Amino acid sequence: MALPKLESPTYTLEVPSTGEKVKFRPFLVKEQKILMIAEESKDDNQIYDAMETLISSCTFGKVDVKTVNLFDVEYIFLQLRAKSVGEMVELNLLCPDDNKTRVPTKIDLTKLDVDIGEGHTDKIPLTSNITMHMKYPTLDNIRTIDKKGSETNSIFSILKSCIHEVHDGDTIYSRIDIS
């Protein structure tokens, strides 16, 4: 006779950028261990892989981390962490006045929210005829950044990967066609 299988509780979250409801479960001890090993490795790609695997597993495959906006990935990860480890996080923040004093602070992860301001748009007018249409960065965009290069080059690399289209009057140039 087989042992009974323990079921994890399930919760629902709303993906900030789409409003889509996604069911998720807390991460398990073995998944937390994968995260800790990735963190100890100090290898960004190993950390990204661990986050990708964890989010995919805990959302029952409903969230594709490769295509979801980075802020959605961060939000989902924080919600997973809140239900798995604890909703409160204690931090010692460095006081900006003297850069020496540490201030203990508690943050309730369930109260965190993504704020997309009123009038937010993905369009950047360059001239009266030319408009750039942007997309949010993804985890894959962040992975491809050359960490050994200058910070300025990294920023331009992210910006370049976030260009979706350029509109010049009636002509539309897709990112794929832009060199």
Per-range role (PLM):
Residues 1-179:
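Long C-terminal interaction/binding lobes of large macromolecular proteins
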